[in-house]
Swiss-Prot record:
Organism: Cryptococcus neoformans var. neoformans serotype D (strain JEC21 / ATCC MYA-565) (Filobasidiella neoformans)
Function: Microtubule binding protein that promotes the stabilization of dynamic microtubules. Required for mitotic spindle formation.
Single biological process term from Gene Ontology: mitotic spindle assembly
Keyword match Cell cycle: yes
Protein name: Protein STU1
Length: 1249
């Protein structure tokens, strides 16, 4: 039964309280509070007297009395204040609330925390007594401002001021005051009130105050303001208008960009719903148009992906963004508006990256229609390459993101992009046609638009335009022909236009255009068989024969592959003798192609691996530089760079020259003419050709060591800028700049595309037929040569996709001694095919010829990890690619764990981990428990309050339900079924467990629970690593744990990041670590330097020395611990990357090094130099390494070079250095030693108290 207190009892208590001394008041207050616990109502006449006596008690210097009032009395008395009439509550807000707000600045947590709770109670009562009235009910004078939080804080009409408004006014005064603790606690009160009242409590009036607090002079206030803003604006229920207003205030009040970007990212990043582009490209399109049409596509990946995400808060925010861009696109391009135009284009791409086109599609389309597309039609034609290139990227991404919603713009843009296909600037022409391919692939306009556009392009005189047009014709038929058949047939004249386009293209003077048209024809034949048959019958005999040979459905019977030691160099003869010499040549060529195809299948089964970064060939002379050799694509996924087949655009076609058509590619007898595996058509000579082509054993030998006196100066190691920038990994970490004329690059599969064949399959020029040793290749007899040329021309595209040879520079021939001046790399074959020793004589028989497959494994790319190859690889009979990496481990191996446990830096953690596992072992069931058995434990973990038993059960469940690495396509079905069964156990559980553990691992948790939670995290990484997707969240969690002062926790983070470096994709982990480090340093800014105003340089320098860690403040120790952790982790990742990737990432790494090298802490400066040494271990070029940090002073550079020399990683000086196997092993040793040094340096960040 609820207890009641009479008016006389309360008055008696009040009288005793007024007359008693402070110690006696404590007893009275505590006893009266106990009486009020079961009371539901107090007499109205006694409320006001108690409200009037409370302020002196709250302001009392007697600490026990103050604590009793706040903790034992107010939580029970304030809810009993009647809500109606509101005079009692108004008196409480006017008398008690100011006193409570004063106590928010009390240093004792129990005081300011209890005061905050009482303020929240008063706020809840105020909102219940007078719910807010919408702003629309106010008159023009604003006097009836009932509950609207957007009202002015300086309300003159006090009688009309509502209770919520009065409560807000007092709290705002505190937030705008000077006491930092009051501000921090006031923001906590605001957060609690918003969580309790929800939408009833508006946000707009608080945003200005909170934005000002983001730039407060006290770090604690800034940190709490960040967290408060994120907590108020991040829930999905937050109105978009509030976010838009917040973004506007950030700009208007000039908040620092680092703070603003971090907050906007945290508020908006979790809202985007991923939307995949329509998968309309079938397997045929993916197979035939998968590769980049020329080397020019290589730099586009790094530039196209290097766009910062722009988050949009609301449709109104998006409308303002577009409106601010429109003035830049008015009129012609000038020196003043071209840069804003480019920034606007990049910003729109950033919006798409932030999913603005998905969340606010209607507003996005309206913005495009409002003038943005018209502006892009100007920028895409800009003479400035960067502006035009960014516009092409945007025009490619818009159809991919918008799909059918982009249809309204297609008819306007196609003519503009069509004109660009004839541009002489190859880079822009290729980018523009990539955009056309994207439009054709992802939009759903009427086929009339595409067919008319393609038909007009085929009628052009420019061969480049015709080449692009026939490739677009092929793409259109693959994507749209089947489902658009009825529309095409129902539109008058459209099918005739399509038929005429085919007739024109099949009779084109350029063979490349004809070949691509033949491939497109058979897709046309599948849909309109009768018309295609009529068209084919109208061709002459030779044209029809070539068309039939291009039929992909024509399959030849497989032939046996070559033997490894007893091969004759030619396939076995047919059972029946060919009737004529011409048929004999045809059969011979067909058998050669079958042999190549069969060897490629063996290579696919033998050398299947994970994707790898590929590169284009580097030519010796700077004069021969293609658009493709401008940079290295940056990896953006755990398996390296995957080229999207649906976005690649075909290259234009060049007409063959007499010199290129009159000569044939033959096996080169000298090392400098070894054909590069990339883009090279590998031929296996027939007996007929072998009679006129001599081989030399020099092909299998290393080039001479002495340099050639006739070597051109432009080929020196130090002279060619291209050689200094682009190098390629050799056997075990060294980087070769080439053998002879060019470096042997990595392998890349080239699609079987006729246009590309015409561009890239260029034969050797006549000036290159003469060898430097004086020997000349003998030509075939004219009659035989003519027959071979005719037959091969008709069958050259029948086989599988081939490797092709880039166009060499005419007239540049070099002797075999050319490569003696640079480190040489053994020739690399595509597959581990069967080989035979070469003949010792120049005219030896063809049995010694080495058979190389040209069929590539589509998955034979690998990430740019450092190679681990044998030092004797160059002398091996079967050679492997120089950039051959081990596949990325998909699971933690026992060897990895054992190696980590043997490190002395983390012994305390391993001992504690074993101890905790032994404690949990009694809970382990005899058989693996079902998934529903740990559902209560997972729910407790998600709530943030798990018990020790909950965590132990989750850890045991993880260890008893491991998930093996995802099987590859070559593995048997049993392995795949086992993987799916193991994965099914975790369906719906893994993300909950992983996210719950990472969120739970915070430094302020109980030590025992925190250590057990770390055990759970370790079990997940060790046993369920194939299921882990969000490594970014994991990195953020590890950096958060660096705020702990517990040595075991810090050792655990050290060991875990060392393991992640081994099992994660290093490029992806490097990006995540950079992001987490930036976030950590933003949360823990550097303390203001006391020597900033010191004019004495010696005193300033000495003040930066950290002589004793005991003198450091806790905040500084925490910052240094996380900073050191991040620098050393990044260094470990760097050691697992290759030189081209380091060159690409060098400026960003250099910025990290430069900031750390200027840090006042000596341990951070030491870590910065260690990171620089790690970069040097990979590049082996101190000039290149120091170029990444151009802001270093000369003294700092000298010190860095001194450290390189002392650690043995400074490169040797001179052009005649010898690349021995011992040197290769030594460089691998340098990496291992540096990894150990970084691990040791990381351990110094463990705070031991």
């Amino acid at each position: 039964m609820p207890k009641t207190l009479t008016e006389s009892e309360v008055e008696a208590t009040f009288a005793k309280l007024k007359a008693a001394d402070p110690d006696r008041k404590v007893d009275i207050i505590q006893f009266f509070g106990l009486q009020l616990e079961d009371v539901e109502e107090l007499p109205a006449s006694v409320i006001d007297p108690f409200l009037l006596i409370l302020p002196p008690l709250i302001r009392s210097p007697h600490s026990l009395l103050l604590s009793s009032v706040l903790s034992s009395f107010l939580p029970y008395f304030l809810p009993l204040i009647p809500k109606h009439p509101t005079t009692h509550l108004r008196l409480a807000l006017l008398q008690v609330l100011p006193a409570l707000l004063e106590k928010l600045n009390d240093a004792k947590e129990r005081i300011h925390s209890a005061a905050g709770n009482a303020i929240v109670i008063l706020g809840e009562l105020s909102w219940e007594a007078e719910p807010p009235i919408p702003a629309s009910n106010l008159n023009s004078s604003g006097s009836l401002k009932a509950g609207s939080l957007s009202s002015s804080t300086a309300t003159k009409s006090k009688p009309h001021e509502t209770l919520p408004h009065l409560w807000e006014r007092h709290l705002k005064d505190v937030l705008q005051g000077k006491a930092w603790r009051s501000k921090v606690e006031g923001m906590k009160v605001l957060t609690k009130m918003r969580s309790k009242e929800g939408a009833k409590m508006g946000l707009k009036a608080w945003l200005g105050v909170l934005v000002d607090l983001l730039e407060d002079g006290d770090g604690n206030v800034r940190d709490q303001a960040r967290e408060t803003v994120v907590e108020l604006l991040s829930p999905p229920s937050t109105p978009p208008a509030a976010r838009s207003e917040f973004k506007r205030l950030l700009v208007a009040r000039n908040v620092r960009k680092t703070i603003a970007d971090d907050i906007i990212t945290r508020i908006l990043s979790g809202e985007g719903s991923d939307r995949s582009t329509p998968a309309v490209m079938n397997s045929e399109l993916g197979k035939e148009e998968g590769a980049s049409r020329s080397g020019a596509a290589a730099p586009a990946h790094s530039q196209a992906d290097d766009v910062d995400i722009v988050y949009v808060a609301s449709p109104q925010d998006l409308e303002r963004e577009f409106h601010s861009m429109l003035p830049f696109f008015e009129g012609k391009e000038t020196e003043e508006n071209w840069a804003p135009r480019e920034r606007s284009i990049v910003r729109i791409r950033g919006m798409m990256k932030g999913q603005a086109h998905v969340k606010y599609q209607a507003a996005f389309i309206a913005g495009l229609k409002g003038g943005i597309v018209e502006g892009m039609s100007k920028t895409v034609l800009s003479l400035r390459t960067t502006v035009a290139q960014q516009s092409c990227y945007l025009l490619k991404e818009l159809p991919e993101g918008l799909g059918a919603a982009f249809d309204n713009f297609v008819e306007f843009l196609l003519p503009i992009l069509g004109k660009m296909s004839g541009f002489t600037k190859k880079l822009i022409a290729d980018r523009s046609q990539t955009a056309v391919t994207s439009i054709i692939t992802h939009t759903t306009v009427h086929p009339r638009i595409f067919i008319n556009h393609i038909s007009s392009g085929i009628q052009e005189k420019n061969v480049q335009i015709r080449a692009y047009s026939v490739n677009h014709l092929k793409t259109f038929l693959i994507v749209h022909a089947s489902h658009a058949k009825h529309q095409i047939e129902a539109t008058p004249g459209l099918s005739d236009t399509l038929d005429a386009a085919f007739r024109k293209a099949l009779a084109d003077v350029n063979p490349g255009v004809r070949e691509v048209t033949r491939q497109a024809f058979w897709r046309y034949h599948e849909v309109w068989r009768s018309k295609a048959e009529v068209l084919m019958n109208s061709l002459d005999g030779q044209a029809r024969k070539q068309l039939e040979k291009a039929n992909p459905r024509t399959a030849a019977s497989p032939m046996p592959s070559y033997a490894s030691s007893s091969s004759t160099g030619a396939p076995s003869s047919a059972n029946t003798k060919p009737p004529s010499k011409k048929m004999d040549l045809k059969a011979m060529l067909a058998e050669r192609r079958r042999a190549v195809k069969e060897a490629g299948k063996q290579a696919q089964e033998t050398n299947a691996g994970s994707p790898r970064v590929v590169s284009n060939p580097v030519f010796a002379s700077p004069g021969v530089q293609h658009a493709s050799i401008t940079g290295l694509p940056r990896s953006s996924s755990a398996v390296g760079i995957a080229r999207h087949v649906e976005t690649s655009s075909p290259s234009p076609v060049r007409s063959p020259t007499p010199s290129s058509s009159a000569t044939r590619i033959r096996p080169s007898p000298s090392p400098e003419r070894i054909q590069s595996p990339i883009q090279t058509k590998i031929e296996i000579d027939s007996p007929l050709r072998s009679r006129y082509t001599s081989l030399t054993p020099d092909l299998a030998r290393s080039p001479p060591k002495s340099p050639s006196p006739s070597l051109s100066p432009s080929l020196g190691l130090g002279e060619s800028p291209l050689r200094q920038v682009l190098t390629y990994p050799a056997a075990n970490g060294r980087h070769s700049v080439g053998e002879g004329k060019r470096a042997i690059p990595e392998l890349v599969e080239v699609a079987d595309n006729g246009a590309e064949h015409e561009v890239d399959e260029l034969t050797l020029k006549e000036g290159q037929k003469t060898r430097d040793d004086g020997n000349t290749d003998q030509e075939l007899p004219p009659t035989v040569q003519e027959e071979v040329d005719q037959v091969e021309q008709s069958q050259q595209f029948e086989s599988e996709p081939r490797l092709e040879h880039p166009e060499p520079q005419q007239g540049n021939t070099f002797s075999t001694s050319t490569s003696g001046r640079v480190p040489s790399t053994p020739a690399r074959s595509i597959a581990t095919g069967t080989t035979a020793s070469l003949p010792n004589s120049r005219n030896g028989n063809i049995k010694g010829e080495k058979i190389i497959s040209s069929r590539l494994n589509p998955e034979a790319f690998q990430t740019p990890l450092n190679p681990k190859t044998s030092a004797l690889r160059s002398s091996s009979a079967i050679r492997t690619p120089a950039w051959k990496d081990s596949p990325r481990p998909e699971a933690v191996t026992p060897q990895m764990m054992q190696k980590l446990k043997e490190r002395r830096h983390e012994r305390s953690w391993w001992v504690k981990r074993q101890e905790l596992l032994e404690k949990a072992s009694p809970l382990k069931p005899l058989t693996p428990s079902p998934s529903f058995a740990i559902l209560p434990d997972i729910e407790a973990l998600e709530l943030g309050a798990p018990t020790l038993k909950n965590l132990q059960k989750i850890a045991l469940f993880c260890s008893s339900h491991p998930v093996r690495p995802e099987p590859t396509a070559e593995q048997d079905e049993e392995e795949k079924r086992a993987f799916e069964e193991e994965k099914r156990v975790w369906t719906g559980l893994f993300d909950r467990v992983m996210n719950g553990v990472v969120d739970f691992l915070r430094p302020d948790k109980d030590k025992e629970l925190l250590e057990q939670g770390l055990v759970v995290l370790w079990e997940i990484v060790q046993h369920q690593w194939p299921l882990v997707d969000d490594t970014q969240r994991l990195c953020h969690g590890l950096f958060r744990l660096r705020e702990s002062s517990d040595a075991v926790v810090l050792e655990s983070t050290n060991a875990l990041i060392s393991l992640l470096v081994q099992i994660s994709d290093p490029m992806l982990l490097l990006c995540n670590l950079r992001s987490s480090l930036d976030r950590f340093l933003t949360k823990h800014p550097a303390p203001p330097s006391s020597s900033a105003d010191n004019s004495d340089p010696m005193t300033s320098a000495l003040s930066q020395l950290s002589l004793s860690s005991s003198k450091e403040s806790p905040e500084k120790r925490t910052r240094n611990s996380g900073y050191l952790f991040g620098l050393t982790s990044i260094g470990m990742c760097v050691l697992r990357l290759s030189a081209p990737v380091i060159v690409s990432e060098g400026p960003k790494l250099g910025q990290i090094v430069m900031e750390a090298i200027n840090d006042p802490s000596s341990i951070i400066r030491q870590a910065a130099h260690s990171l620089l040494l790690a970069i040097q271990c990979v590049t082996h070029d101190s000039r290149k390494t120091l170029a990444f940090v151009p802001a270093m002073s000369q003294g700092q550079k000298d010190l860095a070079v001194y450290y390189m020399a002392q650690n043995g990683v400074l490169e040797q000086i001179g052009l005649h250095k010898k690349a021995t196997s011992e040197g290769e092993k030594g460089r691998e040793g340098d990496r291992d030693n540096m990894t150990g040094e970084l691990a040791g340096l990381m351990s110094r960040g463990v705070i031991r108290e």
